[in-house]
Amino acid sequence: MKKDPASKLRKVMNPSLGKTQTKQLGNWLVKAVLLVLILSATACGQQRQTESRSQPNSAAAADSQKRLVLESATINQPNQQGQTQWKINAKRAVYSPDQKTAQLEDITGNLYQDGKVVLQVDAKRGTVKKDGKEIVLRDQFVATDPRNGATIRGENVVWRPQQDLLLVRQNFTGSHPKLTASANQGKYDTSKQRLELIGQVEATAQDPSLHMKTEHLFWKIQQGLVISDRTTHIDRYKGETITDSAVADHAQVNLNTQIAQLNQNVELKSLDPLLQIATESATWNPEAQTVVSDKPVRIVNSEEKVTATANQGQVNLDTKVAHLTGGVQGISKRNQAQLFANKLFWKIPSPRMQAKGNVIYRQADPPLNTTGTQAKGNLANENIVVRGGDSDERVVTEIVP
């Protein structure tokens, strides 16, 4: 016979039960209710954690599904006037969900100005950023300017079409029929056709054969000018041999005229003849082997130990002749002989000189002081002839006791 469920309830609620039993039964019910509540809360928390962990994965999957992938893609970017600013062909293009960036593979592209191609680029990989305002190019990067034939290579390249600027942040190299160059970094302004080279710059001109070293260099390709505003070393080669070398704080080489303009702390050395020229400004023609200065100049022949200074001067390293004008002074360190004049003709490497205008000759042994209008002779061995010039001009000789 089935028991009535209500009878159990009546037993629990039976007032005939003892107080102790009633109290124990109440405690048991409270604990049971608390246990049920704790288990329910834990289950809910675990469910929420599971849901929260699954949400990012779901979002990532959704983002992945939103990415646009194009094969054999062509991307165009117009300027404000609607003209094509740049065009890129890529074997594969993967766009971000917001369509603001794209990852590219096997890239070829063109940069346009006024409807004409001014730069052709190639790279294995790249990224279009900032709605096409910046393009990063990597791996086997090459850029060519069809207007002048210059080719640029490097790593970690940033192309900013709106600024007409190409930045090569590592291992820059540039080549042109007239010049090759390398540097740590490089910048190319396509509107001005100007390269800026930064850090450990080396440049080699083909004709004449010149090798330049500096820390900062501008290469104006269209004008054929190479300009440095830092200390610059230039070596002239004949075959594999250095024939002349120069150093200056500022230098400009014209690749068209083959002339170098050197300024500030200029020092030029020649091996044949063995000569050193120091001045603040000099025009050096390596091909013609001439050096011209309109500033105070100092010429030293270390072989004969003869030094000449003047307000201006020019030296022909080919014919081995120096012409000095204005406040000329020649000194032989061997015997302390001195020759002063307005003009001086010096046949190098010998110490033979011809002087004109307000000539003064001095020697120490034997002591002698002679003045006149002209002088000729060998300064190193004190064999100098001083003349008065016209018949009414006298030579004054003072013998110092």
Regions found by a protein language model. Name each.
Residues M1-P401:
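Mature-chain termini and adjacent capping regions
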